[in-house]
Amino acid sequence: MSGAEKEVVVMTVPSTRRAFFGFAAGTIGALVATRVPVIAAPVQPASSARSFAQETLAGPFTLPLLDYATSALEPHIDQLTMEIHHGKHHQAYIDNLNKVVAEHPEIGELSVWEVLTDLTIVPEAVRPAVRNNLGGHVNHTIYWELMTPKSLEPSQALVDAITRDFGSIEQMQAAVNEAGLKRFGSGWAWVVSNSGTLSVTSTPNQDNPVMDGAGFPIIGIDVWEHAYYLKYQNKRADYLTAWWNLINWRTVDQLYSLAQEASATPTA
């Protein structure tokens, strides 16, 4: 690292449960509370998410539709990986989540975002299943919308925020890749926004950053082996490097804007 470069700190930013309930009350909760197929608009891929702000665990949840063909992300992510990852793995999280909700209808009135930010409100007997499967559904819904075969440039506001907090887009990417490589076993690497400040973190399994108060995710990369192993085998670093060729900056822009709106919303 040269003297002109800014040191990037991979960190978890503490936040209060009360602050994250501000997310639940605002538009930001929309992204994760999907119960119907989500077909993203070509100009604003995440815009359809706003309509789901009030969704609960009542279900049934269904698999979001992709806004591109399963072959469209090649050569960076192969078609078979996409078919299995989306159609099998994500579907399994949804099936398991629907089973839990059907067997425990008392949790149906809880909002998706409320549960993510405070899993203790879910009965202990089903908490692990909700954590893993709701987290898996939410994380993958974000992941699909963060990829596109035809990426555009990020907005100047987003570039300015990234430059302020990381030094450059390239330094941010390097920090995310490092977090993904250091995540032992299965998990995710994230860029999160917490009160307008961007940082990098990672989570195990299907945990979402809001579960531990790190912030609202604006970029998330799946580093489970099922996301890359057919093409990259044990070369997770190659997958992480290639993934940035697919990033949908329009989605990142919108998630960052939603995070900004939420942080500006009074939580009292």
Locations of regions flagged by a protein language model:
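Mature N-terminal segment immediately following signal peptide/propeptide cleavage
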Residues: G59-D95
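All-alpha RGS (Regulator of G-protein Signaling) helical domain and cognate RGS-like helical scaffolds
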Residues: T56-P60, H76, K88-Q91, K99-E109, ...
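N-terminal secretory signal peptides and thylakoid transit peptides that target proteins
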Residues: E5-L31
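C-terminal segment of N-terminal export signals and the immediately downstream linker at the start
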Residues: T34-L73
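Hydrophobic/aromatic-rich, well-ordered segments within soluble, folded domains that form packed cores
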Residues: H85-Y93, V138-T141, I219-Y229
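A generic secondary-structure signal for well-formed alpha-helical elements
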Residues: A24, I28-V32, Y93, L97-P105, ...
